[in-house]
Amino acid sequence: MAPAQASLLAKLDTQERVRDFLTNAVASGRASHAYLFLGAPGAGKLDAAWALAQAFLCEQDGCGSCDSCVRVARHTHPDVHYYTPESATGYLIAQTRELLDDVPLAPIRAKAKVYIIDRAEQLRANTANALLKTLEEPPEGVMFILLGTSADVMLPTIVSRCQCVPFRLVSPAVAAQAVSRATGQDLARCRMAVAVAGSPTRGIEFLKSAERQDARRQMVRAIDSLIAADEADVLSRAKSLIVVVKAPLAEVKSTQEKVLEQNADY
């Protein structure tokens, strides 16, 4: 029998107050229908959003091991929808319409649905206004999780409709220690992983993936070699770099195709 997996919430040990607050909210049945996670980049807001989504959709408040929890951890659950701005100037109206059209639909696998809206400060007035009513009174079983850096740079109408959750700044040293505890790797390697991946949780995933580490090594070698390269070498090595970059993406695409096949009957 495979060992039980820890829930994503349990792994948020660099944000203990956030972890405990969200855990208690889900366990007590008092989870809000709309959260606004606020904090600096690298504070773990996106990791916490996926963790909350996992706990909210799990019938055991985030056991970490059931089919639903595994799918959320792999970012392949059909009832967790992740949005990020598709334009350099912010969210497009088409994105908002797509979200609003999906909200009334029944969940595919779970009994509820979660919408994660990253960089919510880039919701412009024309796109944000369309969200307001749904954000204030969403259908039963729908949760919104918005991520932003500061309430001061967001529309007040959005902030007032969400329960704000502040995230403290996590120092590189604390982040590296968290990764070291989870992986058993030395601190120097863990500091590198956090710097490369952007957060403790993704740093742990990086250290557990031989493919990602190999791709990074090849990219670093290719970039270093460009210093002494002539024009012909630059073109040749640029092409090889593209191959290296595409390799992990091909792996992700293969995983996504398998998930689509599994969900084809829904």
Segments predicted by a language model, with ranges:
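Charged, glycine-rich active-site and insertion segments that engage polyanionic ligands
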Residues: 1-54, 68-71, 140-142, 149-266
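Conserved alpha-helical scaffold flanking the Walker A/P-loop in AAA+ ATPase domains
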Residues: 21-25, 93-114, 122, 126, ...
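Conserved amphipathic alpha-helical interaction elements at protein-protein interfaces in regulatory
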Residues: 28, 58, 105, 136-137
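Short loop/turn elements that form and flank the Walker-type P-loop nucleotide-binding site
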Residues: 30-31, 73-78, 108-111, 138-141
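Post-Walker A helix-loop "phosphate-sensing" segment adjacent to the P-loop in P-loop NTPases
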Residues: 54-64
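AAA+/P-loop NTPase substrate/partner-engagement loops
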Residues: 64-92, 152
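Structural recognition of the conserved hydrophobic beta-strand(s) that form the central parallel beta-sheet
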Residues: 116-118, 143-148
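Conserved Walker B
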Residues: 119-123, 151
